[in-house]
Amino acid sequence: MAVIKKPDLTDPVLRAKLAKGMGHNYYGEPAWPNDLLYMFPVVIFGSFACVIGLAVLDPAAVGEPANPFATPLEILPEWYFYPTFQLLRTVPNKLLGVLLMAAVPAGLLTVPFIENINKFQNPFRRPIATTVFLIGTFAAIWLGIGACLPIDISLTLGLF
């Protein structure tokens, strides 16, 4: 059972502060209208001006034009698809590859239920979920690096 500290509303000092309007946010200036009407537009327009200025002064290079008659030797997906691309590339059976791809989100869905009794936010107090996260992160990085290499050294990364 979690212990939650609640304010004692029978305390006369606290009741006097609440009567004067001094609750949890009685200091400083109010967010409405000062922040929402005056500061947010300045920040939004400033950010927009920075983005437009960078786009005008230093446009991103699109690259060479596409040539439909010359295809590269190996077509790679975007970088965030490298781990799943590596899974599909190294698993010999197509059905097993699809099942492994479906196992990734299924495994992520089970992580909160592994330690549902322990409600701590600190990862050091949740060793199972932290271990699952670290192993998954290491495997994703390993597979992502391996996807950029030729197929014969992709699993070992050329280290062994």
Swiss-Prot record:
GO MF annotation list: electron transporter, transferring electrons within cytochrome b6/f complex of photosystem II activity; electron transporter, transferring electrons within the cyclic electron transport pathway of photosynthesis activity; ubiquinol-cytochrome-c reductase activity
Location(s) in or outside the cell: Plastid, Chloroplast thylakoid membrane
Bilayer topology annotation: Multi-pass membrane protein
GO process annotations (BP): mitochondrial electron transport, ubiquinol to cytochrome c; photosynthetic electron transport chain
One Gene Ontology cellular component: mitochondrion
Coiled coil: none
CDD domains reported in the protein's UniProt record: cytochrome_b_C
Keywords: Chloroplast, Electron transport, Membrane, Photosynthesis, Plastid, Thylakoid, Transmembrane, Transmembrane helix, Transport
Cited PROSITE patterns: CYTB_CTER
Record field: transmembrane: 36-56, 95-115, 131-151
Protein family: Belongs to the cytochrome b family. PetD subfamily.
Subunit comment: The 4 large subunits of the cytochrome b6-f complex are cytochrome b6, subunit IV (17 kDa polypeptide, petD), cytochrome f and the Rieske protein, while the 4 small subunits are petG, petL, petM and petN. The complex functions as a dimer.
HAMAP family, alphabetized: Cytb6_f_subIV
PANTHER family (alphabetical): CYTOCHROME B, CYTOCHROME B_B6 C-TERMINAL REGION PROFILE DOMAIN-CONTAINING PROTEIN
Role description: Component of the cytochrome b6-f complex, which mediates electron transfer between photosystem II (PSII) and photosystem I (PSI), cyclic electron flow around PSI, and state transitions.
Protein name per Swiss-Prot or TrEMBL: Cytochrome b6-f complex subunit 4
Organism: Tupiella akineta (Green alga)
Phylogenetic lineage: Eukaryota, Viridiplantae, Chlorophyta, Ulvophyceae, OUU clade
